[in-house]
């Protein structure tokens, strides 16, 4: 397995220094690249993320129903949320992919990015313990936990952005597909989202146009709320 460059920089971004750096390397390794890949770490990280977020929501909302807690958790741990976190960490710059995945733009594919976040969580757990993972994840999720509320429909990002702009009597966002890569059965869509109040355009990349639009919309919402 080839060494992945700039791991110390990624550790600083994550807010965690690995004792066993090979665990981070494995977490960033897609199954297309090597036999020792990140799928088992992903399995572990998925469970850890679920228990940490469940515990946080349980204590943050003592009067919330089981249904509300489940819906809020689903919003926080679903793939598009993890993809946005991966993009915030610029994980695509560090992934180790096989030649086929690399050529088809796998470093931008939302499922690969989301899986890598879960694998990193699993790697951090093995390198430390559950309490360290809990504190780190609560840091990663601080803004999202502060914003989420029970009883509120967990609407998708495009709907939330549209309602936000309508409330301000602003023009609706404009979504444009600016690139499509890959074969017909395995395409990667790059979508640009533009709104009046942002001078820059925001890009979403995913395996479908709809998902790419959702990712771009979620990033625009975060920029508007800063």
From Swiss-Prot:
It is found in: Cytoplasm. SMART domains: DSRM, RIBOc. Its EC number is 3.1.26.3. The active site is at 46, 118. Its cofactor is Mg(2+). InterPro entries: dsRBD_dom (IPR014720), RNase_III (IPR011907), RNase_III_dom (IPR000999), RNase_III_sf (IPR036389). The keyword RNA-binding applies. Mg(2+) binds at residues 42, 115, 118. The keyword Coiled coil does not apply. It is an enzyme of class 3 (hydrolase). It comes from the Bacteria. Keywords: Cytoplasm, Endonuclease, Hydrolase, Magnesium, Metal-binding, mRNA processing, Nuclease, RNA-binding, rRNA processing, rRNA-binding, tRNA processing. Gene3D superfamilies: 3.30.160.20, Ribonuclease III domain (1.10.1520.10). It catalyses: Endonucleolytic cleavage to 5'-phosphomonoester. GO terms for cellular component: cytoplasm. Residues 7-129 form the RNase III domain. Residues 156-226 form the DRBM domain. One of its GO terms (biological process) is rRNA processing. One of its GO terms (molecular function) is rRNA binding. Its main location: cytoplasm. Homodimer. Belongs to the ribonuclease III family. PANTHER family: RIBONUCLEASE 3, RIBONUCLEASE III. Digests double-stranded RNA. Involved in the processing of primary rRNA transcript to yield the immediate precursors to the large and small rRNAs (23S and 16S). Processes some mRNAs, and tRNAs when they are encoded in the rRNA operon. Processes pre-crRNA and tracrRNA of type II CRISPR loci if present in the organism. This is Ribonuclease 3. It comes from Shewanella sp. (strain W3-18-1). The lineage of its organism: Bacteria, Pseudomonadati, Pseudomonadota, Gammaproteobacteria, Alteromonadales.
